[in-house]
Amino acid sequence: MAYSKLGRTSSQRKALLRDLATDLIINERIQTTEQKAKELRPVVEKLITLGKRGDLHARRQVASFVRKENAGEKDAIQKLFEDVAPRYAERQGGYTRIMKVGPRRGDGAEVVIIELV
């Protein structure tokens, strides 16, 4: 499968996607560049699908990827399994939406908002 390198090494790219995925789960809406959003979409879709499965192995797989951050009184993993995943119980994929905002002022990079549907 093709992917974008995002100008980073593989470990930096993985760290970036972990951070963005955790932020998207916690906030349910983030603003980033178009390429980062396009790379983030399949990662988050897989995490939500694991959340829908809901068993112990799925929870451990998500825990190995998502950062240990608090989302209010819950952490990101709890929020994924208790709030986000049940919302999509009847939906077969397509959990995210990307909306274009326009070019960023400093460097002209195309900025988008990626959010959970």
From Swiss-Prot:
A GO molecular function held by the record: structural constituent of ribosome
GO terms under cellular component: cytosolic large ribosomal subunit
Transmembrane annotation, as ranges: none
Any coiled-coil regions, as ranges: none
Record-level GO BP terms: translation
Keywords: Ribonucleoprotein, Ribosomal protein
UniProt cross-references to PANTHER family, sorted A to Z: LARGE RIBOSOMAL SUBUNIT PROTEIN BL17M, RIBOSOMAL PROTEIN L17
Quaternary structure and partners: Part of the 50S ribosomal subunit. Contacts protein L32.
Family: Belongs to the bacterial ribosomal protein bL17 family.
Protein name as annotated: Large ribosomal subunit protein bL17
Annotated organism of origin: Exiguobacterium sp. (strain ATCC BAA-1283 / AT1b)
Lineage: Bacteria, Bacillati, Bacillota, Bacilli, Bacillales
